[in-house]
Amino acid sequence: MFVAWRDLRFAKGRFALMGTVVVLITALVGMLSGLTAGLGRENVSAVTGLPADRLAFSAPADGQELSFTDSSVTEEQWRRWAAAPGVESAEPLGVTTVRAEADGRTASVSAFGVRPGSGLAPQEDALRDGRAVLSEGAAEELGLTPGEDLVLSGGRELKVAAVSGDASYSHTPVVWTSLDDWQHLARPAAGGDANGPRATVIALTTADGFDDTDRAAADEAAGTETATRDDALQAIGSFAAENGSLQLMRGFLFVISALVVGAFFTVWTIQRSGDVAVLKALGASTGHLLRDALGQALVLLAAGTAAGTAIAAALGAAVGGSVPFVLDAETVAVPALVMTALGTAGAALSVRRITSVDPLTALGSAR
């Protein structure tokens, strides 16, 4: 690293400029990662927080994907799943977006209907017909506390039994209601028929030995299509579109960082060809020169990503109260490590030229 440190001191301006680029890209990736995680949490936290490992949807039409919006399951389907081998618990869950009013305030909320005692809702002991459990976001937007009343779409009046959790769905706070109350809210879209009243999906808790064969047999018997809880997130339309776009942007930033670092060290290596030739003529091995060049790249990347990560963390902490932003190791440290790895890969590809430098040719051309 002797030559690498001398280069860093000699060409301070060049390396400072490149380091600034790394800092800015790292900060941008860190901010985008935190924002992606925050927006995703506002989209899906109510679903990821369910004490279930699978969700059963009504079977979609040919060529269509699973969707919470289009799904509607019957009581008969729920009972078939409850009796299926390997299923420890099967509970109907209604999901719909409604308008809530209270004391002159209005807000869009997601009504989640569950059977009292099902274990799906927070503080479920307070939940029954005519009562609702509000997420903290819903209570804040409507200015409600336990014991007060709210009116949901269609004139359905409910009393706030409790305020608990920060669940949200499709960027709207969640209001937990009884399944009977939810069916009144969702009617006529989820009205009853000969097979009984409907819900949106069936939340399933399955035994350890429950496999794809068991799932396929139960799906066929009930006329449903089942997905794991994580896979079911793609059935939330806003999440699939939003998360895909943001992840694509983040991926492009990673690729750009590797290209920028690689381009810088390609030019730098070309400019140093004469110096490399002299070192080779003096007996320096190719491996030593490669380690020296890669060490130089690692120093630059480590310093740049550390500074960029610190900036992203500081900005994330500052805006966390006003925008959906998740500040943790996964959203800040992981992008920095990926940036360092990709930048090192780009630098490694660029410094390969060192292996092809012929000391006699380079020294002869220098004369």
What does each of the following model-derived ranges do?
Residues 1-29, 40, 367:
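N-terminal Sec/SRP start-transfer signal
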Residues 93-96, 101-116, 121-188:
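Hydrophobic secondary-structure segments that place a key small or acidic residue at a functional site
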Residues 155, 164-253:
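Mechanotransmission and gating elements of multispan inner-membrane complexes involved in transport
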Residues 291-341, 348-366:
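Short helix-loop junctions at transmembrane helix boundaries
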Residues 260-301:
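Interfacial "coupling" helices/loops that link adjacent transmembrane helices in transporter permeases
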Residues 26-107:
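Hydrophobic, regular-secondary-structure patches
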Residues 38-49, 62-65, 167, 229-252, ...:
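Membrane interfacial helix motifs at helix-loop boundaries and amphipathic/re-entrant anchors
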Residues 18-28, 246-263, 300, 304, ...:
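Alpha-helical transmembrane segments of integral membrane proteins
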